UniProtKB/Swiss-Prot annotation:
<protein>
    <recommendedName>
        <fullName>2-dehydro-3-deoxyphosphooctonate aldolase</fullName>
        <ecNumber>2.5.1.55</ecNumber>
    </recommendedName>
</protein>
<dbReference type="Pfam" id="PF00793">
    <property type="entry name" value="DAHP_synth_1"/>
</dbReference>
<dbReference type="GO" id="GO:0008676">
    <property type="term" value="F:3-deoxy-8-phosphooctulonate synthase activity"/>
</dbReference>
<comment type="similarity">
    <text>Belongs to the KdsA family.</text>
</comment>
<dbReference type="InterPro" id="IPR013785">
    <property type="entry name" value="Aldolase_TIM"/>
</dbReference>
<keyword id="KW-0448">Lipopolysaccharide biosynthesis</keyword>
<dbReference type="InterPro" id="IPR006269">
    <property type="entry name" value="KDO8P_synthase"/>
</dbReference>
<keyword id="KW-0808">Transferase</keyword>
<keyword id="KW-0963">Cytoplasm</keyword>
<comment type="pathway">
    <text>Carbohydrate biosynthesis; 3-deoxy-D-manno-octulosonate biosynthesis; 3-deoxy-D-manno-octulosonate from D-ribulose 5-phosphate: step 2/3.</text>
</comment>
<dbReference type="InterPro" id="IPR006218">
    <property type="entry name" value="DAHP1/KDSA"/>
</dbReference>
<dbReference type="GO" id="GO:0005737">
    <property type="term" value="C:cytoplasm"/>
</dbReference>
<dbReference type="GO" id="GO:0019294">
    <property type="term" value="P:keto-3-deoxy-D-manno-octulosonic acid biosynthetic process"/>
</dbReference>
<comment type="pathway">
    <text>Bacterial outer membrane biogenesis; lipopolysaccharide biosynthesis.</text>
</comment>
Length: 276
């Protein structure tokens, strides 16, 4: 089985030759109220721009730098919130999974199961996610060459699921540093699945603040523009109304009220990149 070059998630279409789509939301699920506020505002932005949109949030940040780091609301609290976001707001929902058992539990509550970058080669996890029949978004590991994602995608498609997204989120370059090799985007596109560019984790500085990760949100738009100019199916952007006080990944998240202008500029680049 080969991956589908066009993956539809709700009203959003992800394809390397289709108009740009968006995956966006806060790093972690903080509360029901916060989730509805963020999802509602992002949905409104996307609708005004005519942009396909999937809401992302993580119920458990299982790879925090420190044991003391806040990890999110947890699975039990997340399940009804995810279901209500889909039903009441009509937004597709993406969340991370970390174990095989979580895949089946979450399958009825979300639209996309995301494999974290650190776990992208875990065969049992990939197979379990694939067998739910949900769309699977795999973050390319910071340690992985782009051409090696072919084997990752093959584990999912061989398990009977052709609906795969692959996401570039930077590659390790020395200690506490990531860089983005834009060649990875067309290389990954050759695999046949839609390619997403994660603009916010690409500016992360893993473990860069000692007991937490740092980052530099100044460069989110720089990298996002470059990726969209190369040509991608979608962008992945973590955003928060108050990034400096967010429980995780604040240094690399985009201020929520700056999202509309950023998205407008990225859509302009996308139109040029995909013009015939």
């Amino acid at each position: 089985m080969i991956p589908n070059p066009r993956v539809e998630i709700g009203q959003a279409v992800f394809a390397n030759d289709a108009p740009l789509a968006l995956i966006a939301g806060p790093c972690q699920l903080e509360s029901r109220e916060h989730a509805f506020e963020m999802a509602g505002r992002l949905k409104e932005m996307a609708e005004k721009l005519g942009l396909g949109f999937v809401y992302k949030t993580s119920f458990d940040k299982a790879n925090r730098t420190s044991l003391l780091g806040k990890r999110g609301a947890g699975l039990d609290a997340a399940l009804p919130i995810f279901a209500d976001l889909r039903r009441e707001l009509g937004v597709p929902v993406l969340t991370d999974v970390h174990t095989e058992g979580q895949c089946e539990i979450l399958a009825d509550a979300v639209d996309v199961l995301q494999i974290p970058a650190f776990l992208c080669r875990q065969t049992d996890l990939l197979v379990a996610a694939a067998k739910t029949g949900k769309v699977v978004n795999v973050k390319k590991g910071q340690f992985l060459a782009p051409w090696d994602m072919k084997n990752v995608v093959a584990k999912i498609t061989a398990s009977g699921n052709p609906n795969v997204l692959t996401t570039e989120r930077g590659v390790s370059f020395g200690y506490n540093t990531l860089v983005t090799d834009m060649r990875a985007l067309p290389i990954m596109a050759e695999i046949g699945a839609p390619v997403i560019f994660d603009a916010t984790h690409s500016v992360q500085q893993p473990g860069g603040q000692g007991s937490s990760s740092g980052g530099d949100r100044r460069f989110v738009e720089t990298l996002a523009r470059a990726a969209v100019a190369v040509g991608v199916a979608g962008v992945f952007i973590e955003t928060h109304q108050d990034p400096d006080n967010a429980p995780s990944d604040g240094p690399n998240m985009v201020q929520l009220d700056k999202m509309p202008a950023l998205l407008e500029r990225l859509m302009a680049f996308d139109r040029i990149a995909k013009s015939k």
